[in-house]
């Protein structure tokens, strides 16, 4: 047996159907698109159009609003913080704040500040300065002998002081 003798199994590679190549091909004339009209033409269908029936986005009620002044915190759990300390990304002896978390790569961006959450355990004695923290996170850090300082909300750079 030679490499040139090896062939694919019968039916493992199916030839693609070439549409619109005569009525004998089985996909000629209209090419599987049915008759005439909008759906037979090329181009985009009308999104959300349900054939005259009241579309779903109009049947459902409007709810809520988007608060343009909403502050979004970068959230970090205790287990993630402990992993970063174990890996050596963060020094437990220094003050841990938003800048140090971004610099170490633990948090990607902290535009509105950082919020500490209580999932997991913390073993190291830490000094943490964050813009928000859950009660369980504060309790866990203080149990390990550390302190949590809650900072005032961050002001936007463009906002007048």
Swiss-Prot record:
Positions of the UniProt region annotated as Disordered: 1-50
Keyword field: Ribonucleoprotein, Ribosomal protein, RNA-binding, rRNA-binding
Domain of life of the source: Bacteria
UniProt GO MF annotations: rRNA binding; structural constituent of ribosome
GO biological process, one term: translation
Ranges of biased composition (kind: Gly residues): 21-37
One GO cellular component term noted in the UniProt record for this chain: cytosolic large ribosomal subunit
InterPro entries xref list: Ribosomal_uL15, Ribosomal_uL15/eL18, Ribosomal_uL15/eL18_sf, Ribosomal_uL15_bac-type, Ribosomal_uL15_CS
Record carries keyword RNA-binding: yes
Coiled coil region boundaries: none
Pfam families listed in its UniProt record: Ribosomal_L27A (PF00828)
Function: Binds to the 23S rRNA.
Family per record: Belongs to the universal ribosomal protein uL15 family.
Quaternary organization: Part of the 50S ribosomal subunit.
Record's protein name: Large ribosomal subunit protein uL15
Species of origin: Nitrobacter winogradskyi (strain ATCC 25391 / DSM 10237 / CIP 104748 / NCIMB 11846 / Nb-255)
């Amino acid at each position: 047996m030679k490499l040139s003798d090896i062939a694919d199994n019968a039916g493992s590679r199916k030839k693609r159907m070439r549409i619109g190549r005569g009525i004998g091909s089985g996909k000629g004339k209209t090419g599987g698109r049915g008759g005439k009209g909008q759906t037979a033409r090329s181009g985009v269908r009308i999104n959300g159009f349900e054939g005259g029936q009241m579309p779903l986005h109009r049947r459902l009620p409007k709810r809520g609003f988007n608060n343009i002044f909403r502050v979004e915190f970068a959230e970090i759990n205790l287990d993630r913080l402990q992993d970063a300390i174990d890996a050596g990304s963060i020094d437990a002896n220094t003050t841990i704040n938003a800048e140090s978390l971004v610099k170490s790569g633990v948090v990607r961006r902290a535009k509105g500040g950082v919020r500490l959450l209580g999932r997991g355990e913390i073993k190291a004695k830490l000094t943490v300065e964050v813009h928000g923290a859950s009660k369980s996170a504060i309790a866990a850090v203080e149990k390990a002998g550390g302190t949590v300082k809650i900072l005032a909300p961050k002001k936007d750079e463009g906002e007048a002081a």
